[in-house]
Amino acid sequence: MTATTFIPPIVPADAIKLGSGRTLRFEGRDHGAAVSYFLVDNDPGQGPDLHRHPYPETWIVLEGEVRLTIGDQEFAASAGDTATAPAGVWHRFVATGTSRLRMVCIHASDVIVQEFAE
């Protein structure tokens, strides 16, 4: 029998906070999980530049409104909506409306791999 390292099941938000903002970045490999995610907390007008991943990314809008660009198509989404960008397809999102955007961005990988267009 081999010994395994126990990874605590609770990850405090402060441990995965991205920079000085409100967004959290969880990479599964660091915590014994097979998936990774961002918990986005953006003000209107904020969002990442155009990028892609070698795996699908699924978004779940928890609060607020967002404009998603997937390939050459744009979609409006709001609280309760779910959308997925296929692997290898350029995409981005921008918080719209008048309130903050809270959204879970699920990466189907234990590490987050991003290639930006510029």
What are these regions (language model features)?
Residues Y37-V40, T84, T98-F116:
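A short hydrophobic beta-strand segment most commonly corresponding to one strand
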Residues V40-D43, R52-L68, I106:
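Short, conserved beta-strand element in jelly-roll/cupin
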Residues G21-T23, Y37-H53, A87:
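Conserved short histidine dyad/triad with adjacent acidic residue
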Residues T58, E65-R67, E74, W90, ...:
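Structural motif
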Residues M1-V35, E115-E118:
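A short, N-terminal "cap"/entry segment at the start of jelly-roll beta-barrel domains
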Residues L50, L68-T69, A85, H91-T98, ...:
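Short beta-strand His + acidic residue motifs that chelate non-heme Fe in jelly-roll/DSBH
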Residues D72-G88:
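Short acidic-glycine-tyrosine-enriched beta hairpin
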